[in-house]
């Protein structure tokens, strides 16, 4: 009968420590790009929905990741990541 191999990898930090560190990084990045009132309202919504649980932590991590990804993809003024906006000719002569 087959058995799973023994865990031979490096010791990983506990999930809750990793999640809290990730949340802190996301929060510090989010306050540089979004109004604090928006972030406070988001935090209140998560707290009212999930309470003080790990499910709430996971939800806010997921939402902040999505918000930051979309923000950068659209073209954040603070970042070089995003869509490159090209000036278009008014008469369309730049098309081949």
Curated annotation (Swiss-Prot):
Modified residue annotations for Phosphoserine:
79, 94, 96
Q: How is it modified after translation?
A: Phosphorylated on several residues by host. These phosphorylations regulate VPR activity for the nuclear import of the HIV-1 pre-integration complex.
Q: Where is this region: Homooligomerization?
A: 1-42
**Main location per UniProt?**
virion
Q: Which domain of life is it from?
A: Viruses
Q: What is one cellular component GO term in this UniProt entry?
A: virion component
Functional description taken from the UniProt entry: During virus replication, may deplete host UNG protein, and incude G2-M cell cycle arrest. Acts by targeting specific host proteins for degradation by the 26S proteasome, through association with the cellular CUL4A-DDB1 E3 ligase complex by direct interaction with host VPRPB/DCAF-1. Cell cycle arrest reportedly occurs within hours of infection and is not blocked by antiviral agents, suggesting that it is initiated by the VPR carried into the virion. Additionally, VPR induces apoptosis in a cell cycle dependent manner suggesting that these two effects are mechanistically linked.
Family as reported in the entry's similarity comment: Belongs to the HIV-1 VPR protein family.
Q: Mind telling me what this protein is named?
A: Protein Vpr
Originating species:
Human immunodeficiency virus type 1 group M subtype D (isolate ELI)
